[in-house]
């Protein structure tokens, strides 16, 4: 007789600390957030071999890996922050882009995960085009170029600060949070958001989430102007900039959904093994 233990230990999480949601913490985040942004639009002045569509493809692959491995929500945006900062300073051949993406996920998971991704597992996701030793060597290269500044501010750092100030029922906040996290992940796949302050992306994502849910009457109704005014006060964001950011976020979601539906209609959806993301693909899976 063979006994199988199928119990899985849940991830141990600390009790929420209200001190971390005080206004002084929010102000500190707003003060330092721009230190961790790419210093230039690197496709124009640094990268000669890498094109925007290549970044989008590797970003989508990274997102699929993070989703399949059930990584914390912060891991993917943080990994993309590392990737963009590295590419903003180091000319990189396109043949090394997936290796760079794997290294960035490796570093981000070490910072945010209880059990980080292993080098061997990440190499499997590259279809073994990257070797573990190569990944470990590049880890040191990336760390050096980033000057070991890994604790970057991401949009997720602002989500709880924003949600706790909203006039919404507590049970509705989890739904708003989930939608906002989806928008943040989508923004990370699109280079146009790479140089936006994280607070702007977080505020726009929450605004887009609430507006979308209000159409389905899932949350308390607020006029668009009232919601925008409230959000700008929380993160000290310019009203016009926030409106423009939110419109761009909604456009990115609409475009990705239309693209997915078109792929389904044309019958071009891949029929390969869906259990392992080995090749970068277009953005198509957004769980709302």
UniProtKB/Swiss-Prot annotation:
Post-translational modification: Phosphorylation at Thr-279 by MAP kinases is required for ubiquitination and degradation by the DCX(AMBRA1) complex. Ubiquitinated by the DCX(AMBRA1) complex during the transition from G1 to S cell phase, leading to its degradation: ubiquitination is dependent on Thr-279 phosphorylation. The DCX(AMBRA1) complex represents the major regulator of CCND2 stability during the G1/S transition. Polyubiquitinated by the SCF(FBXL2) complex, leading to proteasomal degradation.
Residue ranges of domain Cyclin N-terminal in the record: 26-151
Annotated compartments: Nucleus; Cytoplasm; Nucleus membrane
Modified residue annotations for Phosphoserine: 270
Annotated keywords: Cell cycle, Cell division, Cyclin, Cytoplasm, Membrane, Nucleus, Phosphoprotein, Ubl conjugation
Record's GO cellular component terms: chromatin; cyclin D2-CDK4 complex; cyclin-dependent protein kinase holoenzyme complex; cytoplasm; cytosol; microtubule organizing center; nuclear membrane; nucleolus
An example Gene Ontology molecular-function term: protein kinase binding
Pfam families from the UniProt entry: Cyclin_C, Cyclin_N
Recorded superkingdom: Eukaryota
Region (Disordered): 264-288
Keyword Magnesium carried by entry: no
Keyword Cell division annotated: yes
SMART domains linked to this entry: CYCLIN, Cyclin_C
Swiss-Prot/TrEMBL GO biological process terms: adult locomotory behavior; cell division; cellular response to dexamethasone stimulus; cellular response to follicle-stimulating hormone stimulus; cellular response to growth hormone stimulus; cellular response to insulin stimulus; cellular response to testosterone stimulus; cellular response to X-ray
InterPro entries assigned: Cyclin, Cyclin-like_dom, Cyclin-like_sf, Cyclin_C-dom, Cyclin_N, Cyclins_cyclin-box
CDD domains: CYCLIN_CCND2_rpt2
Phosphothreonine, modified sites: 279
Primary location: nucleus
Function text: Regulatory component of the cyclin D2-CDK4 (DC) complex that phosphorylates and inhibits members of the retinoblastoma (RB) protein family including RB1 and regulates the cell-cycle during G(1)/S transition. Phosphorylation of RB1 allows dissociation of the transcription factor E2F from the RB/E2F complex and the subsequent transcription of E2F target genes which are responsible for the progression through the G(1) phase. Hypophosphorylates RB1 in early G(1) phase. Cyclin D-CDK4 complexes are major integrators of various mitogenenic and antimitogenic signals.
Quaternary structure and partners: Interacts with either CDK4 or CDK6 protein kinase to form a serine/threonine kinase holoenzyme complex. The cyclin subunit imparts substrate specificity to the complex.
Listed name of the protein: G1/S-specific cyclin-D2
Species whose genome carries this gene: Rattus norvegicus (Rat)
């Amino acid at each position: 007789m063979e006994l199988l233990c199928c119990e899985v230990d849940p991830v141990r999480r600390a009790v929420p600390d209200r001190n971390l949601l005080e206004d002084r913490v929010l102000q500190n985040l707003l003060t330092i957030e721009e230190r961790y942004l790419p210093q230039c639009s690197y496709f124009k002045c640094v990268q000669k071999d890498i094109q925007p569509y290549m970044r989008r493809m590797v970003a989508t692959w990274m997102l699929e890996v993070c989703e399949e491995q059930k990584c914390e929500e912060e891991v993917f945006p943080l990994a993309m922050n590392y990737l963009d900062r590295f590419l903003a300073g180091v000319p990189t051949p396109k043949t090394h882009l997936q290796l760079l993406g794997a290294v960035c996920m490796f570093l981000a998971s070490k910072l945010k995960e209880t059990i980080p991704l292993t080098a061997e597992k990440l190499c499997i996701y590259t279809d073994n085009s990257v070797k573990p030793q190569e990944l470990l060597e590049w880890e040191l290269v990336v760390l050096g170029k980033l000057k070991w500044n890994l604790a970057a501010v991401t949009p997720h750092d602002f989500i709880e600060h924003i949600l706790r100030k909203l006039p919404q029922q507590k049970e509705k906040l989890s739904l708003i949070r989930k939608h906002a996290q989806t928008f943040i992940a989508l923004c990370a796949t699109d280079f146009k958001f790479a140089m936006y302050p994280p607070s702007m992306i977080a505020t726009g994502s929450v605004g887009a989430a609430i507006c979308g849910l209000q159409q389905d009457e899932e949350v308390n109704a607020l006029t668009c102007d009232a919601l925008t005014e409230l959000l700008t006060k929380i993160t000290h964001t310019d009203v016009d900039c926030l409106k423009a950011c939110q419109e761009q976020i909604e456009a990115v979601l609409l475009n990705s959904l239309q693209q997915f539906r078109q792929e389904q209609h044309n019958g071009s959806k891949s029929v390969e093994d869906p259990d392992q993301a080995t090749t970068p693909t277009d953005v198509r899976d957004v769980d709302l």
